[in-house]
From Swiss-Prot:
Belongs to the arrestin family. Adrenal, cerebral cortex, heart, liver, lung, pituitary and testis. It comes from Rattus norvegicus. It comes from the Eukaryota. The gene is Dar. Keywords: Sensory transduction. This is Arrestin-D.
Length: 71
């Protein structure tokens, strides 16, 4: 998992993701992401090996989850 934007690049591992459900992803504390940070407006597009691939809608997102893509 990787998040990239103009000022931030954060790599996420399986252990970084606590849960993914009902359009919400819950992160453990890491780098600049807040503890138990919730990233709303996720759309689950596929799931493989227990890891979901998601993409964010373009509205109502905190700065730390803009352009976040799971792959």
């Amino acid at each position: 998992l990787k998040h990239e934007d103009t000022n931030l690049s954060v790599s996420l591992t399986d252990s970084s993701v606590v849960s993914l459900y009902s359009g919400t992803v819950l992160f453990k504390s890491m780098h600049t992401l807040p503890t138990n940070a919730r990233c709303p407006n996720l759309s689950v597009i596929s799931a493989t090996s227990g890891m979901s691939q998601c993409e964010l809608s373009q509205s109502s997102m905190p700065w730390w989850c803009r352009s976040l893509v799971f792959s």
